[in-house]
Every structure is written in structure tokens, then in C-alpha cells.
Amino acid sequence: MRLTLRQIKWLKVAIWLAAALPFLWLILSVDQGWFSADPAKDIQHFTGRMTLKLLLATLLVTPLARYGKQPLLIRCRRLLGLWCFAWGTLHLVSYSVLELGLSNIGLLGRELVTRPYLTLGIISWLLLLSLAVTSTLWAQRKMGANWQKLHNLVYVVAILAPIHYLWSVKTLSPLPIIYAVTAAILLALRYKKFRQWCR
């Protein structure tokens, strides 16, 4: 049974709630002091994990639509991608403000050079920015075939973002590995397209 347009609309509402409610939980956690003795790190990790979850969810849409024979699911991909960018931006802001401080924001450039995992993170964010800015139908029409080429850069983000996470943790735990393996599986499902894009 294929999903209807009405069901897709409700699915989009569910995506909004699933992506927005964690932000309210984040605010409440800060207000109530639910984080550990290092809340800045907790916030950075939380926002980073949310970004990765939404990135993986975005990549999952096409295989689900194709193998599940649900073509209308593709209509959810843009929304997931925009939420991924929103959480990625929050992740970047949380590091810049909480880790460096507003008075030392100029240190960000030096940090990017001395900490390679940050370089991967900022590259991932810049790619997400380019995808978010060009996610409109107007941009798609104006760019023509180049639009798809640009948006295939999400595969690069799917490689860099899990590496950024793995590299950033001081003690290796199962969670970063799970994200990396999941990303690898999702890329493997699109092996032919990924290989064509790499050429």
C-alpha cells in the first residue's frame, strides 16, 4: 500500500516534531541543570548527534522510497535536510560560543588549523549550507543539471561528518562507530550512483 499525499503531510508534521522537540528539551536541560559538570561539552555533543541523526535520516529516504515503492517519501527529504542544517548550525554556534567564547571568536580560524577534526566539521557545515541555500524549486530550475551535481555533495558530508565525530571523542565508544557504520551502509546502498559521482 502506497502512502497518500495526506499521509505524507502528517509524516512531515511528525518530522517537525521529532526535529524541534529535542531543542525544547535542550533548553529545559540547560535551565534545570540536567547536564554533567561540563554542560558546554554536553550541548556540543547533543547538537552534533542530532545533526548526524538527521543526516542519516535524509540519506535513508531514497532507499526507503525505492525499495519500499513509496515514491512520495521523496517529498520528506528536503525537510529532513533543512533540519539537519539547522542542527548543524546550532552545533557550530555551540562550539564557537561555549568553547571559545564570544570574546575569542577570532580564534576559530586557528582552531581549524590546529585541530583537523574541526576542519572536517566546518567543511561539512559549509557543504550543508550550500545545499540548504539551493534547496528551493527556484534554485533547482535555475541550476538545471548542476543542481543534482551540487546536491550529490551530501555523500561527502556523509563521509566527513562521522569521521569528524569519531576523531573528536577522546574515548572511543560504540555510538560514533554506529553512526559511521550506518553512514557506510547507506552509501553502499547507493554504490552505483556514488561511484558515478566520484568519477
UniProtKB/Swiss-Prot annotation:
Keyword terms, alphabetized: Cell inner membrane, Cell membrane, Electron transport, Flavoprotein, FMN, Heme, Iron, Membrane, Metal-binding, Transmembrane, Transmembrane helix, Transport
Residues annotated as signal peptide: none
Pfam families: Ferric_reduct
Membrane topology (UniProt): Multi-pass membrane protein
Highest taxon, organism lineage: Bacteria
Organism of origin: Yersinia enterocolitica serotype O:8 / biotype 1B (strain NCTC 13174 / 8081)
Gene from which the chain derives: msrQ
Cofactor note: Binds 1 FMN per subunit. Binds 1 heme b (iron(II)-protoporphyrin IX) group per subunit.
Protein name: Protein-methionine-sulfoxide reductase heme-binding subunit MsrQ
Oligomeric form and interacting partners: Heterodimer of a catalytic subunit (MsrP) and a heme-binding subunit (MsrQ).
GO cellular component: plasma membrane
